[in-house]
Amino acid sequence: MNAFSPWLLFLGIGFAGLAAAQDALKPAAFQRSGTDVFQRISSALDPASCTESAAKSTWMKEYIHIPDRFERQLIVMLPILDHVSYQARKRGLPMEYALIPFVESRFQPKAVAKGGPTGLWQIMPETGRYYGLQIGGKKDGRFSVIQSTDAALSYLQKLQIMFDDWQTGIMAYNAGDSRLRSSLRRQGLTKADADKRLPTGLAPHTYAYVKKIRALSCFMFDPASFGVNLPNDAVFTPLEADTDPIAPAPDNGN
């Protein structure tokens, strides 16, 4: 699962295409606002995840160097950010995990990277199949917001149980849990605590992954300090299983 980068290819037309897909959702029994989503996230994030260095990091500048554009992107992201954060909270997972799709794909469900990572969570085929996604032929559950989120959070739940540390869990999501276990064994550790001691021997981009999540946490805690006005008044229709606009076609046995 790779971080979003310039070589990321899109099977669609980016944010405009995602916005059009959201417009196609059928009316639901209720709506939510941006306030609902951002309060849910900021209230559940660990305050320690935002350090002074994270707030001033190059990743923060990269993500929010044009505040007006970032605000518009947040509006488009809202239905998906709502679903991901709600499901993470429902499972009792650290809310930092709900920020992973921003790092992976900028919350774009049709993102495809070289080497196989696909969808909102940039899931590899073997991982997706292991967690119940149908991948093959014209069907690929990684393009479904709801299906891919269920699979990714199931994997993250396993990582959280395995490492009991959200930073190590995020590194394992990026580098693979077997690599993280090997790193801990080399250090003579049986349990991770990335606040005190980072696992060694990992790729630079894996360590950067944690820095990116920390930067986004800082933004969620205090967006105004970065010149961004959250779209709190934006109203949207929550995603539902039968309105997922990017779900694969149902298998009718044909």
Task: Show the residue positions of the predicted features.
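Catalytic cores of secreted or luminal carbohydrate-active enzymes
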Residues: T206-P231
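Short, functionally critical alpha-helical segments immediately adjacent to catalytic or ligand/cofactor-binding
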Residues: L93-P109, G169-N174
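Glycine-rich, acidic and aromatic/proline-enriched surface loops and short helix-turn segments
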Residues: R106, L120-L133, A175-R179, F219
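Bacterial N-terminal signal peptides
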Residues: P6-A16
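Substrate-binding/active-site groove segments that recognize
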Residues: G115-G137, T149-L156
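An acidic, Gly/Ser/Thr/Pro-rich helix-cap/linker signature
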Residues: A19-G92
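Catalytic and binding regions of secreted/periplasmic enzymes and modules that target cell-wall glycans
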Residues: L156-R186
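Low-complexity, Gly/Ser/Thr/Pro-rich intrinsically disordered linker/tail segments
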Residues: S225-N254
